[in-house]
Amino acid sequence: MREKMIMTVFAVAAFSTNVAYAQLRKIPAEVTNVFTDKFPNATNIEWQDQLVDYKATFTDDGKNYSVKFSNNGEWKITERIIKKDFLPKSVIKGFSKGEYAKWEIKEVTIVEMPDYKKHFKITVAKNNLNKRDLLYNADGQLVKDNFTF
């Protein structure tokens, strides 16, 4: 009985390792080349394979960023966490007039995407289960309101 238990443990461990390893793909050259062109001074780069795209977290000029690229190297989004004190007055004004003004601000991010100029994402929470990502343009207009975890 003990032998079967030990063999089962080894089999599960071996299978688990193979499954975890199978999820990792090599980052395509198309992705890394576009990344290097866009962020030539990036340091502390860490890549994540998110199956439908690739995400890199890195430091550039002392600031922490995350960026996503499609599988073929198309730039999708860049985000950088900032302090809420660095939000433009127009965004603060727009947020303070909105329905989530009394919710707790959890995180503020500068967001850049190919289709948008610079935007500002404010993640707010009413409680542990009720959280929203609010995307504002530079004029302080709410562009997107998404439920988040």
Kindly give the residue locations of the regions a language model identified.
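Interaction-mediating elements
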Residues: Q23-F149
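Bacterial Sec-dependent N-terminal signal peptides
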Residues: M1-K26, F35
